[in-house]
Amino acid sequence: MTMTMKSLSDERLIVQAVINGMGANLLLDTGATVGLLSDGIKRKYKLILGKKFPRKLVGAGGEFTAYYCHTFAYVGGKPVTQFLVADIDNVAASVREQTGIEIQGIMSLPQMKQAGIQIDANDNLIMIEE
């Protein structure tokens, strides 16, 4: 069985998630190899941080340091794991400027595959295998 969700935006693929019982918006990024949660939400969402990630990450927002995160996000009731916590303010600002939506994190392609997520980009639909 498959659950279908509509993206919160037509400009970017954004889904609603739950992190520690609170709603969050995650940008789906098929070009990302790691999932990121904003370091700006770590207190409010009570993120459990681990050790410093051993490498610098380079992305659209530049180069940055990240920490392992031991907190899951749930999308359509399915757990999404393996997030890092980093400063994603530049990416979040770009998304907010384009869509008016505040994101709390970025879900990577490996995470989407792990959660059984498929994308219909033409109709901005996200299908999740249950």
Q: What does each of the following model-derived ranges do?
A:
Residues 1-130:
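Pepsin/retropepsin-fold aspartyl endopeptidases
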